């Protein structure tokens, strides 16, 4: 999808309901950005693109204090939640701004580090976004990117409802202009965007039987099919009926109680350095 001037337009597949923000707010800088942390030092200026409710952004601010950290998001509700959390945590070296990763509202060479955590998976033109990220980085600056590789996502037991949800989620992502597989090309895309040097790794997160994450995942599925943006897209495109979506949601509580739950998520982490 695109605007009249050719700029990509995307819809965030998870939406912005309360459950989404609560789920995102569980994430921390130490838990999600281990591949970046060794490169951070006190006093750095950091941009967190697609900051969501701000939990990762706040962690970054605590790590590089007194360096200044900016959280950027396109959705006002996310920014309001982020500001509240920063106030509760009494973190002062941080601010939040509204904006698009395609048109960052900052002069060139403003930041030492830019982060995009589970953000570029949702955009139709990651190359354009990375070129814009590179523009606002200082010489020697570092971009840190993390995104999932959906074809390797695995969850058991593979119920009819779970399999159907996976199909619909992929259809919605692709309809919104995103790619399920772009993450494996991150090094190439970073180089094409003008970064001088890159690194990338694959990792995974276990969602094993008794872990809280495994129990939460089916309930996330339930909330997802009830989320207005997701549901509206599926119904408008004729991919499923109201009854099918309701059946998927209704199956989630029983799935969450299963003793044989198991799954894992594969993701790619990448670093790109600007020439000094």
Regions found by a protein language model. Give the residues of each.
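A short acidic, Gly/Pro-enriched loop at the edge of an enzyme's catalytic core
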Residues: 102-113
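A short glycine-rich, Lys/Arg-flanked "PGG" loop and its adjoining helix->strand segment in the class I
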Residues: 127-142
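Conserved alpha-helix/loop element of class I SAM-dependent methyltransferases that forms part
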Residues: 25-44, 59, 63
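Conserved catalytic/acceptor-binding region of the Class I
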Residues: 144-213, 221, 225
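A short SAM/SAH-binding and catalytic strip from SAM-dependent methyltransferases
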Residues: 112-125
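C-terminal helical/coil "lid" or tail adjacent to the Rossmann-like core of SAM-dependent
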Residues: 12, 18, 201-263
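Class I SAM-dependent methyltransferase Rossmann-like catalytic core
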Residues: 4-28
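Class I SAM-dependent methyltransferase SAM/SAH-binding core
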Residues: 8, 45-49, 53-103
């Amino acid at each position: 999808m695109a605007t009249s001037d050719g700029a990509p337009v995307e819809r965030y597949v998870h939406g912005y309901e309360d459950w989404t923000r609560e789920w995102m707010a569980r994430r921390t800088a130490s838990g999600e950005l281990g591949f970046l942390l060794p490169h951070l030092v006190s006093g750095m200026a950091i941009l967190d693109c697609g900051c969501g409710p701000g939990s990762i952004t706040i962690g970054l601010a605590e790590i590089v204090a007194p360096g200044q950290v900016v959280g950027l998001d396109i959705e006002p509700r996310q920014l309001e939640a982020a500001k509240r959390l920063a106030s509760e945590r009494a973190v002062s070296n941080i601010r939040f701004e509204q904006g698009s990763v395609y048109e960052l509202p900052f002069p060139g060479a403003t930041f030492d580090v830019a982060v995009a955590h589970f953000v570029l998976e949702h955009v139709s033109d990651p190359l354009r976004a990375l070129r814009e990220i590179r523009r606002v980085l200082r010489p020697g600056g570092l971009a840190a990117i993390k995104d999932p590789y959906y074809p390797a996502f695995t969850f058991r037991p593979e119920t009819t409802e779970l399999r159907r949800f996976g199909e619909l989620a992929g259809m919605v992502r692709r309809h919104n202009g995103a790619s399920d597989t772009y993450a494996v090309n991150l090094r190439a895309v970073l180089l094409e965007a003008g970064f001088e040097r890159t690194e990338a790794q694959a990792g995974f997160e276990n969602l094993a039987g008794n872990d809280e994450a495994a129990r939460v995942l089916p309930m996330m599925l339930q909330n997802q099919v009830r989320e207005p943006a997701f549901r509206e897209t599926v119904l408008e495109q004729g991919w499923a009926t109201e009854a099918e979506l309701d059946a998927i949601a209704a199956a989630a509580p029983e799935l969450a109680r299963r003793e044989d739950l198991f799954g894992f998520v594969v993701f790619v982490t990448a670093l790109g350095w600007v020439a000094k």
